[in-house]
Design a protein with these regions (language model features):
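Gly/Ser-rich helix-loop-strand patches that form or flank binding pockets
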Residues: 1-26, 114-115, 119-157
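Amphipathic coiled-coil/heptad-repeat helices and related helical stalk/stem segments
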Residues: 3, 47, 81, 104-105, ...
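Short acidic/Ser/Thr-enriched loop-to-helix initiation segments
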Residues: 9-14, 24-65, 71-90, 144-145, ...
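General small-molecule cofactor/ligand-binding pocket signal
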Residues: 19, 63-65, 95-100, 151
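Conserved short-loop catalytic and cofactor-binding motifs
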Residues: 35-39, 96, 127-130
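Short beta-strands and strand-loop turn motifs
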Residues: 63-67, 121-124
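Glycine/small-residue-rich hydrophobic helix-like segments
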Residues: 73-127
Length: 157
């Protein structure tokens, strides 16, 4: 089991899925898989077949979370990508939860508690070195602060 900066290095530099299991995590069946989705380029980046197969193999329910810090600002692309995710995963019939928090970790923690999520799924996106100076990686934050297993799948592009 890896945790911390070594873990995030592995996640960022490998092409295979990485399962991060916190040291204080106790084994339990996977009944609910939560996906923290940013709804950016979902059709091009989401490994939908792998996710669908995994969810079916575990016989779990999938709940998709999107955190929109400003719910008053209507974004047609956000709505479109929500519809696309529903279409991509129609065989597993995911539930959707649009949350609104300034803090991503708080949003994720409350989502996990509300839906009793057993495993969190993330798809880390490649960012430029310059972008990484100004934007904190959500995957990195979760790797350091999650209390449930975190499955990191490589983005398709």
């Amino acid at each position: 089991v890896l945790m911390g900066s070594n873990t995030t290095h592995v996640v960022n530099h490998t092409t295979i899925p990485v399962l991060i299991v916190p040291s204080d995590c106790r084994w339990q069946p996977i009944n609910v898989i939560g996906w923290a989705c940013d709804y950016k380029d979902v059709v091009k980046t989401t490994p939908a077949i792998a996710i669908g197969d995994f969810v079916e193999a575990t016989e779990a329910k999938m709940v998709v979370m999107h955190n929109n810090p400003d719910p008053k600002a209507f974004d047609p692309e956000l709505f479109h990508n929500n519809v696309m995710v529903a279409e991509m995963f129609k065989r597993i019939k995911p539930e959707f939860d649009m949350v609104s928090y300034e803090d991503f970790l708080e949003a994720t923690h409350n989502f996990v508690e509300k839906h009793k999520v057993d495993m969190l799924l993330v798809i880390p996106k490649k960012t430029s070195w310059f972008e990484s100076l100004f934007k904190r990686s959500h995957t990195k934050m979760l790797a350091f602060h999650s209390h449930i297993p975190l499955l990191c799948l490589r983005s398709l592009s």
